[in-house]
A protein has these predicted regions:
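Internal catalytic-core helix/loop-beta-alpha segment
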Residues: 91-145
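A short glycine-rich beta-strand->turn/loop micro-motif centered on a GG-aromatic cluster
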Residues: 141-144, 163-177
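Histidine-anchored nucleotide/phosphate-binding helix
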Residues: 34-39, 151-160
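Gly/Ser/Thr-rich loops at beta-strand to alpha-helix junctions
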Residues: 146-150
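Short, contiguous clusters of charged residues that form electrostatic/catalytic patches at enzyme active sites
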Residues: 30, 34, 123-126, 130, ...
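Active-site acidic carboxylates
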Residues: 1-108, 164, 175, 180-194
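Short, electropositive alpha-helical surface patch
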Residues: 68-81, 111-127, 159
Length: 195
């Protein structure tokens, strides 16, 4: 039996329509909801049962206001996804699928840039990788924002940890179209399934 899970990377307002808005972000959210709906139907369940049949894990950039990656601190990015702000919130259409235990924060240490959600931790302090193992996950489907950074790093870390990684190409947003295409090509060469 294949044990599947979905990892939703950084579908947060600052990456959708805020300080670091990415290309294709609204479409990525819409397509992610369609994918979740298709999994609900495939499993023969109701919407409220999807989390039991097909766990959905959320990765959340969760920065302190003085994070070292921000331009104001000498970094390369505008301030974004600051903990406790609207920009750091998960898109409202995805909230019915969010649970505290399956939400993992990254970028919390102001001195460390953290693109991958693999080491992000939940409210109990458990890293995402550990939780996926506890769920007996073999196949991880990934969607989110942005292809060239957090999505790619998360996919690569999942692959290194031994999971079969399926990147949902219609459910991702990106900073730059050419960079997005290059990242997809390189991830496919690494063994990540682009679907």
């Amino acid at each position: 039996m294949t044990n599947k899970a979905l990892v939703v990377v950084d579908m947060l307002y600052d990456f959708i329509d805020g300080s670091l808005a990415c290309l294709n972000s609204e479409e990525a959210v819409r397509r992610t909801l369609e994918f979740i709906d298709s999994q609900t139907k495939e499993q023969g369940g109701e919407d409220h049962e999807i989390l039991d049949m097909f766990p959905i894990l959320f990765i959340r950039d969760h920065h302190p206001a003085d994070h070292s990656s921000f331009k104001e601190q000498g970094g390369i990015w505008p301030a974004h996804c600051v903990a406790g702000t609207h920009g750091g919130d998960i898109h409202e259409d995805l909230l019915p699928y969010v649970s505290e235990e399956l939400t993992f924060d990254k970028g919390c240490n102001k001195s460390v840039e953290q693109y991958s959600g693999y080491e992000g931790v939940n409210c109990a302090g458990q890293p995402m990788g550990e939780v996926l193992e506890l769920l007996d996950t073999t196949d991880v489907y990934v969607c989110g924002i942005a292809t060239e950074y957090c999505v790619r790093n998360t996919c690569e870390d999942l692959l290194k940890a031994g999971f079969k990684v399926h990147l949902l190409k219609d459910c991702i947003a990106y900073v730059d179209h050419d960079g997005h295409l290059k990242a997809l090509e390189e991830m496919a060469q690494e063994g990540i399934s682009i679907e």
